[in-house]
Every structure is written in C-alpha cells, then in structure tokens.
Amino acid sequence: MNRLSASERQAALRELPGWLELEEREAIGRSYQFTDFSEAFGFMTRVALAAEKADHHPEWRNVYRTVDVVLTTHDAGGVTERDVKLAKAMDAIAERCGAR
C-alpha cells in the first residue's frame, strides 16, 4: 500500500473533522472525549474488533474519559488509505458511543 501524498492527506483530512496531521511524524491523530471511563473503554473495545477485522491497528492511549489515537501504516512509512478508512470507522463508532 502506498503512502498518501501531502495533497491526498489534506483532502482526506477535510473529510475527517477533528483529525490532524501530526508534525512530528508521518501520521494523523485525534482525541475523543467521552462521558466517563466506561464509555471510553466501550469505544476502544468496539474499535479493537473493527481494527482486528481490517488487520490495521491504532496506536492509542486512554486516560479516564479521553482516548488519544494515532494512525499510520508502518509498512508504508506514513499515512495510507487504510488509515483514512479506520479513522472514518472510529468516528462512526465514537458517535454511537457518545463521544463529544
């Protein structure tokens, strides 16, 4: 899978509100806020199932009601269409889980 060009990344990010291109590396990132830890953990559980099915896994961390996510395709050395697809799936799951 090929890395997205700078213009392709920018076009993808326009369709992904809340996602940012990370300056320190070839990746995109986002933070999700939930009402409480249970909602945050429920979101992570649902994403884990989708990520496993897609065989593409996020880098993430959870502190109480916040989930910080970084997406990149290590084999390609940057952001690919797989990251964009997973970001869209995560946004849909987050909405169903009550993210703010």
From Swiss-Prot:
Q: Which Pfam families match?
A: Pterin_4a
Q: Report which superkingdom the organism of origin falls in.
A: Bacteria
In the record, what terms sit under GO molecular function?
4-alpha-hydroxytetrahydrobiopterin dehydratase activity
Keywords in alphabetical order: Lyase
The first-level EC class reads lyase
* GO annotation terms (biological process): tetrahydrobiopterin biosynthetic process
Catalytic reactions on record: (4aS,6R)-4a-hydroxy-L-erythro-5,6,7,8-tetrahydrobiopterin = (6R)-L-erythro-6,7-dihydrobiopterin + H2O
Q: What InterPro entries does the record tag this protein with?
A: PCD_sf, Pterin_deHydtase
Listed EC numbers: 4.2.1.96
Family recorded in the similarity comment: Belongs to the pterin-4-alpha-carbinolamine dehydratase family.
Q: Per its record, how is this protein called by name?
A: Putative pterin-4-alpha-carbinolamine dehydratase
State the species of origin: Rhodopseudomonas palustris (strain TIE-1)
